[in-house]
Amino acid sequence: RHPIDVRFIEFMPMGEGTRWSDSCFWSAPDILDAVKGLVAVAPVEQEQRNGGPARLYTLSGPDGPGLGRLGLISPLSSHFCTSCNRLRITSDGALRTCLFDDREYRLRNALRHPKLGIEAVRRIVTLATRDKPIGARLLERRHNAVAQRRMTAIGG
């Protein structure tokens, strides 16, 4: 009855000491296959997506098409690094250009400094986006954490 989007996010190996195994990993294609066993699934056209990392699908059941959509975010099985357009600012004022890269750019001091202002922030963001990694080499680092900070410390 309501247009609710539901997203499934594959396991993201984040945080110091994270270890994982293929036997405990449920991939986005496996999730999609399970959903296809229940309802009809159709991909959402690119121009109707919100620009995020999720691959979106409409669902139709015996009562007709659903109002919401299914989104699958697949950092491991079908990584989205080359199309990523995201930046994150952590709660302690650091800019991160990639969840899976530990490089951070300090924004807090520039934001708080009365004389630096928006131009200093703009320079930092420009530098950070110029250095944004194209791919995080997730599969090369399999079974180990790819970033030291946990998602709860990064935000997202």
Region annotations inferred by a language model:
Residues 65, 78-156:
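Radical SAM enzyme core and accessory elements
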Residues 1-70, 75, 109:
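Radical SAM enzyme [4Fe-4S]-AdoMet core and its adjacent flexible, acidic
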